[in-house]
């Protein structure tokens, strides 16, 4: 397990990454953290009673029409391991994707228990592997979640990810 500190314009969030149980997904996130990839990006999609989404490189400019469409230039394989069935519970960090094997840099933090996003639930086409959990700063997550949003669930007041680093 590895912890990262996400400094945001709303405050700090500490996340425990499941590097032992989810080595592909958590390892990819950690590799991007170590490169400074997430520094200066914004939460580009916030839905109260659901989640906060970030990690799109186009969100460096939070007014870009392309927010939510970017990747690091590659995608990773879905990590669906029988011994790592972490549910999309409150405070968990999950891989955003647009279909099978399409995850890259975008992630979301669940603000409610979204079990319908669990990869092993065959009744839904969604498959979002959990690879970490907020261990400090859920009050900051809730603060960001409560922001006013406009079209496409984009915050009207920018919610910046100042930096993410190993802690």
Positions of the model-derived regions?
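Cyclophilin-like peptidyl-prolyl cis-trans isomerases
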Residues: 1-167
């Amino acid at each position: 397990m590895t912890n990262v500190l996400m400094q945001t314009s709303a405050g700090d969030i500490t996340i425990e990454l499941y590097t032992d149980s989810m080595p592909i997904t958590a390892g990819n996130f950690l590799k991007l953290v170590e490169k400074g990839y997430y520094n200066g990006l914004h939460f580009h999609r916030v839905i109260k009673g659901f989640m906060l989404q970030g990690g799109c490189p186009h969100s460096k400019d939070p007014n870009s029409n392309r927010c939510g469409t970017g990747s690091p230039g590659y995608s990773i394989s879905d990590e669906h391991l029988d011994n790592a069935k972490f549910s999309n519970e409150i405070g968990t960090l999950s891989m955003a994707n647009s279909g099978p094997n399409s995850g890259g840099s975008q992630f979301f933090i669940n603000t409610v228990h979204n079990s319908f996003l669990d990869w092993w639930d065959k009744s839904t086409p969604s498959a979002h592997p959990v690879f970490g959990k907020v261990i400090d700063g859920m009050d900051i997550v809730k603060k960001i979640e409560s922001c006013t949003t406009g079209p496409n669930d984009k915050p009207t007041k920018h919610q910046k990810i100042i930096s993410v680093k190993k802690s």
